[in-house]
A protein has these predicted regions:
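N-terminal and secondary-structure boundary signal
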Residues: 1-274
Length: 274
């Protein structure tokens, strides 16, 4: 959405203070661990843009809280699997040989939104080591969340998603829906269903003096039914844990990650049957 259209739909600009108040009303409290998926344009016009949104989140969480965001870089993946857009097969060996290695400081996010990309570059933010599905975190639990992110099965048991689960963290959908809810991928890794596939992935990683193309196993993830899962979760008995409200102009949801992951695992085993 263009900035002009955002201005047109906004009656009063959002500020750090107004966003913090909205977050508090939604249920964000000091000391929480919160994984945020976000859309800046959904919030309306914000004084200070993405920097102000992050400031509001950090103020709402306080010094004891930990803010987490996805920092994925899907362009550092096996090129034979690219679809949006695909590239010629003759390019694949060139990409594998020459794609720059993942660097937690330099590698930008892709398709995560400007709030997540801004957060990645801020002082004090830690980023996990996975070349494709890294996460960034800031706060007392940041090291625990981002350390020891395994290369294989990058959104499974040895991932930041699993550490957030261990910490009884929360998911905040800030103007986005469950199609963006990466915690459901943790459920994909844990659940057993007939269509589940393990694939060979690849990515460029740094070595002591250069880089190499590493290959590793991963679950062939699929988010196409995540919105349906989210709607079923809201309608279920488990859905009472979801807090819904407005932050700026955005429809938002705050929920315990464990409840979402556990429900999603059961849903996948029941519904992904063919």
């Amino acid at each position: 959405m263009s900035e002009g259209k955002i201005v047109q739909k906004t009656e009063v600009p959002a500020t750090v203070e107004s966003l913090q108040a909205d977050l508090h009303a939604l249920g964000v409290k000091p000391g929480m661990v919160v994984l945020v998926h976000s859309s800046l344009s959904a919030l309306g016009w914000v004084c200070g843009g993405s920097v102000a949104v992050i400031a509001a989140l950090q103020k709402a969480l306080g010094s004891a809280g930990t803010l987490v965001m996805p920092a994925h870089s899907p362009d550092l993946t096996e090129p034979s699997g690219w679809e949006s857009p695909p590239v010629p097969e003759s390019w694949w060996p060139v990409i594998r040989e020459h794609m720059l290695a993942y660097d937690p400081v330099l590698t930008p996010t892709r398709s995560m939104g400007i709030i997540a990309e801004t957060f990645r570059k801020q002082r004090g933010v830690l980023r996990s080591a996975h070349p494709q599905v890294s996460f960034c975190a800031c706060g007392p639990q940041a090291s625990r969340i981002t350390n020891n992110h395994a290369l294989a099965f990058g959104m499974g048991e040895h991932s930041p998603l699993a550490r957030i689960y261990d910490l009884h963290g929360f998911i905040l959908l800030l103007g986005v829906d469950h199609g963006n809810n990466t915690s459901m991928h943790l459920a994909e890794h844990r659940a057993t269903f007939p269509t589940k596939r393990v694939i060979q992935q690849g990515a460029p990683i740094a070595t002591a003096d250069s880089r190499r193309w590493a290959t590793f196993e991963d679950v062939d993830i699929d988010s196409s039914d995540f919105d349906r899962i989210g709607k079923d979760f809201l309608r279920s008995d488990a859905g009472h844990v979801v807090r819904r409200g407005r932050v700026g102009l955005a429809d938002c949801q705050l929920m315990p990650q464990r409840d979402v992951v556990d429900f999603t695992g059961g849903w996948l085993e029941e519904n992904r049957s063919n």
